[in-house]
Amino acid sequence: MRRAAVLTAGSWGSVFAKVLADAGARVNLVARDPEIVRAVNTRQVNPRYLPAIQLPDRVRAMSDAGEALAGAEFVVLAVPSQALRSVLAGWAPLIGPDAVYVSLMKGVEVGSQLRMSEVITQVTGVSPDRIAVVSGPNLAPEIAAEQPAATVVASTSTSTAEAVQAACWTPYFRPYTNTDVIGCELGGAIKNVIALAAGMLEGMGFGTNSLASLMTRGLAETLRLGVALGADPMTFAGLAGLGDLVATCGSPLSRNRTFGEKLGRGLTLAQVEAEQQQVAEGVRSCRPLLAMADDLGVAMPITRQVERVLYEGLPPMEAVKDLMSREPGPEYRLRP
């Protein structure tokens, strides 16, 4: 029986623990909250994030990361992207030398501009061949309810990707493999920023044409930056690109879309952050993504306007006007 450790017991981490267990693994779920540990181990429920979902008996919760990581073949990392470096530094000495690292995170680190797999390598020294990235249209509540969904498992090592694929394949969760880690991680990070913009449109009362235009041009930004960084353009037409973008921009279950909707209704960044407890990754990722684009001479006008709304106090309606008043040009332009 496969053994996995999931760190930590947030919404997506808990759901992925369920997926792994339903696929046959024994799963240790790390939770800091003693109440979550008790509830999972006595009632198979995570009362904070998945109160209506019964977790499989093969999922056990614990607060001791060392205990959870002992003997784990797969170490699944599901923490806020900006916290990864600090928490992984403490966990790294506890992880076995042959374990595969599985990243569920969708963000870019502020300051370093590193993708999450790059942070894992930098902190642990592990080879990229032992890291897999899971990315796709994976809204946690729907997967928890066992609604059919697909995802991408990306690794520079085909055998690593296939091992993780086998470990998380269930009747309701279908993983595909890919070797384009750059494209899959960028797709997951940038779609959060575009989803903030999609939420702003919703909050301002705009309709389907506006949303479709935003999503399509947001995908163009993603493609341009991805190509400049060496990603495969086809990745962005797949689950980790278009698929994730559609789910995150279109669903009220999306944290980033919900966050953006509140901004579109007139709330400030500070007000929304005080009101919304769960992390909206696009809020922190937009600046390092813009820095990457600027370094490469890549135009990302939507991302730039989102950054202005978040950090310069630009009214969302003014951001729309600025985007629509830009000089028009050709639709397809991969290179700067």
From Swiss-Prot:
Keyword Cytoplasm: yes
UniProt cross-references to PROSITE patterns, sorted A to Z: NAD_G3PDH
This enzyme's EC code(s): 1.1.1.94
Localization terms from the record: Cytoplasm
GO cellular component: cytosol
Domain of life: Bacteria
Pathway the protein takes part in: Membrane lipid metabolism; glycerophospholipid metabolism
Record keywords: Cytoplasm, Lipid biosynthesis, Lipid metabolism, NAD, NADP, Nucleotide-binding, Oxidoreductase, Phospholipid biosynthesis, Phospholipid metabolism
Annotated GO MF terms: glycerol-3-phosphate dehydrogenase [NAD(P)+] activity; NAD binding
Catalytic activity of the protein: sn-glycerol 3-phosphate + NAD(+) = dihydroxyacetone phosphate + NADH + H(+); sn-glycerol 3-phosphate + NADP(+) = dihydroxyacetone phosphate + NADPH + H(+)
Chain sites annotated for binding NADPH: S11, W12, R32, K106, A140, R255, V279, E281
Record: active site: K191
Pfam families: NAD_Gly3P_dh_C, NAD_Gly3P_dh_N
Protein name, UniProt field: Glycerol-3-phosphate dehydrogenase [NAD(P)+]
Sequence positions that bind sn-glycerol 3-phosphate: K106, G136, K191, D244, S254, R255, N256
Enzyme class: oxidoreductase
Primary localization: cytoplasm
Top-level taxonomy: Bacteria, Bacillati, Actinomycetota, Actinomycetes, Frankiales
